[in-house]
């Protein structure tokens, strides 16, 4: 077998001190080789312990602007599936969005040869085509120890022959970047006689979240993150708030005020609402709660979350660096729904009297376990009750036939 590694360009991965990223001595550097685009990059270094699912993770908008470290020792061995193939709902069949969102990836060992029946190209070719930096030959165990101790950190990947990047702080308008620029419409299958109508607030939604809604019999209208959702909410059977990247306070002047208005509208008190990940955090902020930054976040496919209402443990898929401060939730409104059994952080909240709940983890889980996919069924049960209560009063008058059928960038 040819020694591809020996001919690959040399590269360096540097992790900077959180307290003083501009210091020339305040960093740890690792030597490796480049197998992605021949460009250097900088971003916030985070790590995932997921064993599989690198194509899904790299196309998850929640990772926008970050450098993703994989703890799985060998990455790339099953290649990359088609980014064009779509399912019956016109959703991407294998990826979570049309393009890679991570700024760079760090692996211990890159698999120069791949094999899988869905693969159409190698991970290296994909990264090069998408202009994404990728470095291999890195001691990722040592990297994770650093990130575990000092938290998610400014970092750089420098490729031989490319410019030398400077560490930068996380961007602040990430949701604005990844959100659809105009509403689009995803239709349920024609075999569904009376589909529900869901308004989805796109803060960086994954394809599989939309799929989990439409495959259960919902027509989904996806709106930009800053859309005045209250103006159309009475036309829908439910509101959904998606996942997304970055600090939730970046949406304090956009999504949060709209959600607050939605929660306070008297005629919409019975309207079902479901939020996931960033959507959970934004719902908490709109309700008067606060969020906190975690040291190194939770990014894995095997994190136990306890349902505080039943005592049942769910094994969950997670990807977040912030969490809701459960002690700041208003006593008269929400109560904790799930708790992380590893670090005891909040994993969800549920309203004491209204059909509203949210989770920090990803029940749609692609990749990852499907233990908590039943939460989508619970959401649909809430919409069934809402439809029975409101009857013909809830009618979609928005002209969905004039909308796009996929994300608008």
Swiss-Prot record:
InterPro entries the record matches: Anth_synth/Amidotransfase, CarbamoylP_synth_ssu, CarbamoylP_synth_ssu_N, CarbP_synth_ssu_N_sf, Class_I_gatase-like, CPSase_GATase1, GATASE
Subcellular location: Cytoplasm
Protein origin, superkingdom: Eukaryota
Active site residues of this protein: 277, 362, 364
Protein family according to the UniProt entry: Belongs to the CarA family.
Quaternary structure annotation from Swiss-Prot or TrEMBL: Heterodimer composed of 2 chains; the small (or glutamine) chain promotes the hydrolysis of glutamine to ammonia, which is used by the large (or ammonia) chain to synthesize carbamoyl phosphate.
Function: Small subunit of the arginine-specific carbamoyl phosphate synthase (CPSase). CPSase catalyzes the formation of carbamoyl phosphate from the ammonia moiety of glutamine, carbonate, and phosphate donated by ATP, constituting the first step of 2 biosynthetic pathways, one leading to arginine and/or urea and the other to pyrimidine nucleotides. The small subunit (glutamine amidotransferase) binds and cleaves glutamine to supply the large subunit with the substrate ammonia.
Full protein name: Carbamoyl phosphate synthase arginine-specific small chain
Organism: Kluyveromyces lactis (strain ATCC 8585 / CBS 2359 / DSM 70799 / NBRC 1267 / NRRL Y-1140 / WM37) (Yeast)
Origin organism lineage: Eukaryota, Fungi, Dikarya, Ascomycota, Saccharomycotina
Encoding gene (name): CPA1
């Amino acid at each position: 077998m040819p020694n591809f590694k020996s001919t690959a360009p040399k590269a360096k991965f540097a992790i900077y001190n959180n307290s003083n990223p501009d210091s020339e001595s305040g960093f740890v550097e690792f030597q490796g080789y480049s197998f992605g685009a021949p460009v250097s990059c900088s971003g916030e270094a985070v790590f995932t312990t997921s064993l599989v699912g690198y194509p899904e993770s790299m196309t998850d908008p929640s990772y926008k602007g970050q450098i993703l470290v994989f703890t799985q020792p060998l990455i790339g061995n099953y290649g990359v599936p088609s980014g064009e193939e779509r399912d019956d709902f016109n959703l991407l069949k294998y990826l979570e969005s049309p393009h890679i969102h991570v700024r760079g990836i760090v692996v211990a060992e890159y698999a120069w040869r791949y094999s899988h029946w869905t693969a159409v190209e190698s991970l290296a070719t994909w990264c090069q085509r998408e202009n994404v930096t990728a470095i291999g030959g890195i001691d990722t165990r040592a990297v994770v120890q650093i990130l575990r101790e000092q938290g998610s950190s400014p970092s750089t990947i420098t490729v031989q022959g490319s410019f030398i990047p400077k560490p930068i702080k996380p961007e602040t308008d990430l949701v604005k970047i990844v959100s659809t620029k105009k509403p689009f419409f995803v239709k349920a299958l024609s075999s569904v006689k009376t589909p529900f109508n869901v308004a989805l607030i796109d803060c960086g939604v994954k394809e599989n979240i939309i799929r989990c809604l439409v495959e259960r019999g919902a027509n989904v209208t996806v709106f930009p993150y800053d859309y005045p959702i209250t103006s159309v909410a009475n036309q829908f059977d439910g509101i959904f708030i998606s996942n997304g990247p970055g600090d939730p306070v970046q949406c304090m002047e956009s999504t949060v005020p709209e959600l607050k208005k939605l929660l306070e509208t008297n005629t919409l008190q019975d309207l079902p609402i479901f939020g996931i990940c960033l959507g959970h955090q934004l719902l908490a902020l709109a309700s008067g709660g606060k969020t906190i930054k975690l040291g190194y976040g939770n990014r894995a496919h095997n994190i136990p979350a306890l349902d505080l209402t039943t005592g049942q443990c769910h094994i969950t898929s997670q990807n977040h660096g912030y969490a809701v401060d459960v002690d700041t939730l208003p006593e008269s409104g929400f109560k904790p729904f799930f708790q992380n059994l590893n670090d005891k952080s909040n994993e969800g909240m549920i309203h004491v009297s209204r059909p509203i709940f949210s989770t920090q983890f990803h029940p749609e889980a692609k990749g990852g376990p499907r233990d908590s996919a039943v939460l989508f069924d619970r959401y649909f049960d809430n919409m069934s009750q809402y439809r029975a209560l409101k009857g013909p009063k809830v009618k979609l008058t928005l002209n969905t036939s004039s909308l796009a059928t996929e994300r608008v960038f």
